[in-house]
Amino acid sequence: MEKVKQTIRAPRGTELQTKGWVQEAALRMLMNNLDPEVAEKPEELVVYGGIGRAARNWESYQAIVDSLKTLESDETLLVQSGKPVAIFKSHEDAPRVLLANSNLVPKWANWDHFRELEKKGLMMYGQMTAGSWIYIGTQGILQGTYETFGEAARQHFGGSLKGTLTLTAGLGGMGGAQPLAVTMNGGVVIAIDVDKRSIDRRIEKRYCDMYTESLEEALAVANEYKEKKEPISIGLLGNAAEILPELVKRNITPDLVTDQTSAHDPLNGYIPVGYTLEEAAKLREEDPERYVQLSKESMTKHVEAMLAMQEKGAITFDYGNNIRQVAFDEGLKNAFDFPGFVPAFIRPLFCEGKGPFRWVALSGDPEDIYKTDEVILREFADNEHLCNWIRMARQQVEFQGLPSRICWLGYGERAKFGRIINEMVANGELSAPIVIGRDHLDCGSVASPNRETEAMKDGSDAVADWPILNALINSVNGASWVSVHHGGGVGMGYSLHAGMVIVADGTEAAAKRIERVLTSDPGMGVVRHVDAGYDLAVETAKEKGVNIPMMK
């Protein structure tokens, strides 16, 4: 991948570079994904998650930009793995962009085949929100991480993480949410990363409190704050596959243990034990096969240490990076003895059609987001947990790129919020249109047996029809852009997932599209969990009037 040093920043304000606000939204969100405040390696088009890109290469990026600038409001741009391949006449209510990223026929759905294609310039890895142009920086995963640690606190520690120590690793675009999510729940956290730049970035954006290269200092500070029952987050420079076994050897057992290193990609995401970043980069280039094997061996040691801590009483869970699968494939037969975070903590929310709903102010004016915060506090005042989240986010979350907000809203709530936002754009309360989207990690848009659909009640973990149906219904209902991806979060061969974005531009046509899309999208989550036999989903469907032909 050619590195290009240019600073990309989404335009602000109300002046259009395109032929309509939906096209403008797609253009600005693509550019926002590559804003240096947002992207992990913008010079390589990498947004987050190892090699999760916004476009296949710089030539494709420029062609997408040019296409969006000339796209008519009754045309649809097709993007295949980060490359624009066609513009077809469609209609005004159709999506302006349809994206398919990283999809491979199942027999060939592995990293080796993907890398062959990538080397030939035929494919890119879109992760989840990188290739679908709706990444908003670390805030995008923050509330989900906050909810996860909050539920862990409710189940195991009396409702708060006060006086507890969490140990984790990985402070990239996704994992970087962990320190703040733990301290928001009142706890102490040591978060390990092998890359000083990642820790520095989290400290700069106020997601992490302090930096150290000393395990002794990290433990001393952690114990001091744990005893005081005060929150603090400590970024520790080092390799988790060395530090966790060392803690086991010393008989030090944290209260909570998890991991968000980029273990989904053994070549580009994980650094083997004993290598500096520079040495790892050299080996990756010279002998990728040996690199991958060393990575897998390190991951196995990492998981062995997590299992040892679990045996000693630590609440241990997988945070969706597929590290258990790698260790299992390397011969660690009890790798799955600790659960994934979705079955352990999140699935009840999915049954209610809840998930990581997000919106972005195309104006670039933070005041537009603060006004939408007030809508949440007013319209959902009975949901104290949600309102607490909004108040904390306002105080503690620094915007990256275009101002944005995330909060978990459920079936019925998303459509209600979307209607209000569109009205606020129409009457001038908000200074420009708002982009509404979500992560692919949502209630009805992903099939991922080691993460979102792990341990489904009916054994349907690997059924991948649901994300396809999700993308189809969102497209026909008029989402502004829709994406279908493979391999996000857990790597090649382990997931299929779909994304959608809808633009609130204040028009009556947008109001109708918003009503349809923000009903069917979370509705798919309720439907998927009803089909799998979850009582809470059945209750939700009956209460909300979701039409499911064979529901008992």
Curated annotation (Swiss-Prot):
GO cellular component term of the entry, any: cytoplasm
Which GO terms of type biological process are on file?
A: L-histidine catabolic process to glutamate and formamide; L-histidine catabolic process to glutamate and formate
Q: EC number(s) for this protein?
A: 4.2.1.49
Q: Any binding details for the cofactor?
A: Binds 1 NAD(+) per subunit.
Pathway the protein takes part in: Amino-acid degradation; L-histidine degradation into L-glutamate; N-formimidoyl-L-glutamate from L-histidine: step 2/3
Which GO molecular function terms does the record list? urocanate hydratase activity
Identify the keywords attached in UniProt to this record, alphabetized: Cytoplasm, Histidine metabolism, Lyase, NAD
Q: Which reaction does it catalyse?
A: 4-imidazolone-5-propanoate = trans-urocanate + H2O
Q: Which Gene3D superfamilies match?
A: Urocanase like domains (3.40.50.10730), Urocanase superfamily (3.40.1770.10)
Positions annotated as active site in the UniProt record: 407
* Residues that, per the record, bind NAD(+): 49-50, 127, 173-175, 193, 239-240, 260-264, 270-271, 319, 489
Q: Which cofactor does it need?
A: NAD(+)
Q: Which PROSITE patterns match?
A: UROCANASE (PS01233)
InterPro entries attached to this UniProt entry: Urocanase, Urocanase-like, Urocanase_C, Urocanase_central_sf, Urocanase_CS, Urocanase_N, Urocanase_Rossmann-like, Urocanase_sf
Q: What is its main location?
A: cytoplasm
Record-stated family: Belongs to the urocanase family.
Q: What biological function has been recorded for the protein in this entry?
A: Catalyzes the conversion of urocanate to 4-imidazolone-5-propionate.
Protein name stated in the entry: Urocanate hydratase
Q: Source species, please?
A: Bacillus cereus (strain AH820)
- Gene name? hutU
